[in-house]
A protein has these predicted regions:
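Accessory, non-ATPase domains that flank or precede helicase/AAA+ motor cores in DNA-metabolism machines
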Residues: 1-164, 168-189
Length: 189
């Protein structure tokens, strides 16, 4: 693992009072743990490959736009923001617009969802607006798929990752935004 991943693992080990070796072991794909060489893994194109060069434009209402601008002002520094709204209130549109701004700066975006079954619909929502490489990462994927995504993130071939908690351990090279959707969900604690 590289120095940035080691920093994340050291932090997680300290914060959760968990042995460093086990944190590192949990952060690595199983192929790496088993010593399978990267060259032995055939890399497939992602199932969520770009679909269209024509994307819809994100139109925010006044309240959404105000929230977007407030978060955008602080996006270059480490800061946290909470967007509170019921399902269907337009939080995703704000996320999309923030992600587009971050990607313009050649940064990657991580979107954490509480359940595996939310990844396909979240990917679909983002693909409507963003014509970039969007991939998922969660325990329901094959080992080959997870390793491919892990390598794509490491090689900065992915713009947006949508996944469950374990996706925080992906080896991002230029992470510019983390969105935790439904952060109140107990599966994210």
């Amino acid at each position: 693992i590289d120095s940035e991943m080691m920093k994340v693992c050291l932090w997680a080990s300290d914060y959760y009072e968990y042995p460093l070796g086990q944190v590192i072991f949990g952060a690595l794909p199983s192929q790496v743990k088993r010593g399978i060489a990267i060259k032995d893994i055939k890399i497939f194109e992602d199932q969520y490959k770009r679909t269209s060069s024509k994307q819809m434009v994100v139109n925010l209402n006044d309240e959404q736009n105000s929230i977007f601008k407030k978060i955008l002002r602080n996006i270059e520094s480490f800061s946290t923001s909470l967007i509170y709204g019921i399902t269907g209130s337009g939080k995703t549109e704000i996320y999309v617009k923030l992600a587009k701004e971050v990607i313009k700066k050649d940064k990657q975006v991580l979107i954490i969802v509480p359940e595996i079954n939310l990844t396909p619909q979240t990917i679909s929502r983002f693909k409507i607006y963003i014509d970039k490489n969007i991939q998922s990462y969660h325990s329901g994927q094959t080992l080959k798929r997870k390793m491919t995504t892990w390598l794509d993130v490491q090689n900065k071939k992915v713009d947006i990752i949508i996944g469950t908690r374990s996706s925080i351990f992906l080896p991002f090279k230029s992470l510019g935004l983390i969105i935790i959707d439904e952060e109140h969900d107990t599966s994210l604690k």
